[in-house]
Amino acid sequence: MASDLGFSPPEVPEPTFLENLLRYGLFLGAIFQLICVLAIIVPIPKSHEAEAEQAEPRSAEGPKKPKAAIASTNKRPKKETKKKR
């Protein structure tokens, strides 16, 4: 029936390589975002083995000294001078 009326199919150019790359890159980006959102929403319970491994290195390091106390002992005291007016 369309051929009887003289209609022809629309002329749509083939997508170029960059257009295809952009299209599939956007799809992959959207899928990655969905995975990230689902990872935030759905909590995954941690196993007890992973918690034990993380606790051991912390106790092996020992207590750390604050950096501020170390920095103040290394500085030389400044000379005190009176301002001349």
UniProtKB/Swiss-Prot annotation:
The keyword Lyase does not apply. Residues 49-64 have a biased composition (Basic and acidic residues). It is found in: Membrane. GO terms for cellular component: membrane. It is a single-pass membrane protein. The chain crosses the membrane at residues 24-44. InterPro entries: UPF0239. This is Protein MANBAL. The lineage of its organism: Eukaryota, Metazoa, Chordata, Craniata, Vertebrata. The gene is Manbal.
